[in-house]
Every structure is written in C-alpha cells, then in structure tokens.
C-alpha cells in the first residue's frame, strides 16, 4: 500500500498533501519504531512524513510503554532531524487512556479518536476527550464516523447524516473508508457541500441513536478484542 501511495504522490502531489504515518510498533520500543519509520519512508519514496502517529494505544499500560520502551524518544529524534513535523496518537477503545496521554505533559500535535452519533452515548470520546483536545489546541481526526458500518445496520440515522454529524464537530478531518469510487465521490461531495448541524440538530441526531447506543452493541471495538490487531494482542500477552 505504501508503494502505491508513493506512486500517487509523484509529479508534485507530495507537496499538496499532509502525510500521517502510523507507527505499528506495538511494543512501543525505540528500535522497532525507528526501523518501521525508515522502511515506510523508503517504500513511499519520500524523505519525510508530516505527522508520526502512534497507532492503537488501547491498553492501560501503553502510555507508560511509550516512555519506558523508547518509542516516544524515536519520534522526538525524527522530529529533531526534521523528518517529521508533529507527533500524535490514535486509539479506539477507552476515553480514559486518551485522557491519560493528554495529561502526561507531552505537547501532542494530533489525536485520532472514534467520533460518531453512537459514541455520544457510550464511553464517549466526544464528551470526555474532544473538549480537552480542543482546549489544548491539538488537531483532531475523527475515525469510525459510521462506526465501522454499524450506523447502517442500526438503522436509526443515515450514514450521510452520521458523516454530517462528524463534519459538524470541532475536528480537523474525518477519516472514512470507501470500498468503491462511487462511495468515495459521494463522501467527498458531502464533505465539500454540507451545511453544519446547529446545536439543536446535533442533539436530535444523538437522541435518535440513544436507544441502541447505550449498551455498546454497535461499538464493539470499545468493549471487545475483536477489532484489536493480532500483534497488539500478542505483545500484551493475549492470544490473537
């Protein structure tokens, strides 16, 4: 995938995009983090990424591992060498882990979190983490805007209404997968033509979702290991 990305960024397109690199070194150690970083630069065919983002910070000891195992040192070294500009992190499971990272005293540049109308009711990143990130001036990327497709299965709001809900939050970008060009074009059109929901409309969308959102049945990535990576499970002592 990174090689394909490199091909797409030739002929001047690299300067027109912001590249966020997600570090998949789940032991959070210096050596593996830096090795993966260098390999990704080579595959993409660039000398820098804009943001280094630590992926899948979902275990309570992940914040300590970043410090104790040297992963954060690797990112700071890459920034000192001007091979990245900013440092961030992502996770999909527990708002309190995001808060733990935000409150550790490190000046994060980016945070990625699952935001959608279901999240507002269940273990909510929108209510617990988003205000703190905004207060600190940290850029936010909304992930899982349709809850991995669960919004469509829940049949309480349309997927396009869920996207519009996320676009109306104080975020820098919304990350939404598309499995074909038609859906991609539809999402892009919505992103460039939507009218933000006002506060009353946001509340109405939340209310529509509340009856099926409270037990987390449509956000199982928060409460189960079904969506955790095999490598992440293994390094934390779980059987993938």
Predicted regions and their residues:
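Conserved residues at beta->alpha junctions
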Residues: 24, 91-92, 175-178
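Short hydrophobic/aromatic-enriched beta-strand-loop microsegments
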Residues: 15-19, 107-114, 195-201
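Active-site phosphate/pyrophosphate- and oxyanion-stabilizing loops and adjacent acidic/basic residues
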Residues: 3-7, 38, 99-100, 164
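Short, well-ordered alpha-helical microsegments
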Residues: 1-5, 94-99, 181-184
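N-terminal binding-site loop/beta-alpha segment at the start of enzyme catalytic domains
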Residues: 1-17, 74
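Glycine/proline-rich, positively charged
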Residues: 27-128, 134-141
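N-terminal small/glycine-rich loop or linker at the start of catalytic domains
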Residues: 16-23, 53-56
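Structured C-terminal cap/extension of enzyme domains
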Residues: 7-9, 104, 127-240
